[in-house]
Regions:
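Cross-family detector of peptidyl-prolyl cis-trans isomerase
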Residues: 1-124
């Protein structure tokens, strides 16, 4: 919840972020690679105060919102960025152009030919 209040790394081209359901605590092993800037996936910083005097979200302004109401709101958590592609973005763009359709429980965006990442390394 502290990360929600402060914001975090941004979902911009080439970053890796944790996939999850609507429950912000559900991120486990799936991730996605941002192939465009997706700032709407970033955590929404919560200004100081209780109540929060002025809060803006999705082009709307809210006033005097109880802090606990904001900190416990799943919509504000965003998707946690934990890495970045530093080499091989051309491969990611090829993956992006793979034809997709429905698959398993998903109605769309599933590659028609499975994509396998054979190698990835951590650079500190």
């Amino acid at each position: 919840q502290d990360a929600v209040a402060k914001g975090g790394l941004k979902n911009v081209v080439g970053t890796l972020a944790m996939a999850r359901t609507n429950d912000p605590q559900s991120a486990t092993a799936q991730f996605f690679i941002n192939v465009k800037d997706n700032t709407f996936l970033d955590p929404t910083p919560i200004p100081p105060g209780d109540p929060v005097p002025v809060f803006e979200y999705q082009n709307k302004t809210y006033k005097n919102v109880p802090r606990n109401q904001l900190v416990s709101s799943p919509q504000l958590f965003g998707y946690t960025v934990f890495g970045k592609v530093v080499e091989g973005m051309d491969v990611i763009l090829k993956m992006k152009s793979t034809p997709t359709g429905s698959g398993g429980p998903f109605p769309s965006d599933v590659p028609k030919t499975p994509i396998v990442i054979n190698s990835a390394i951590v650079i500190k």
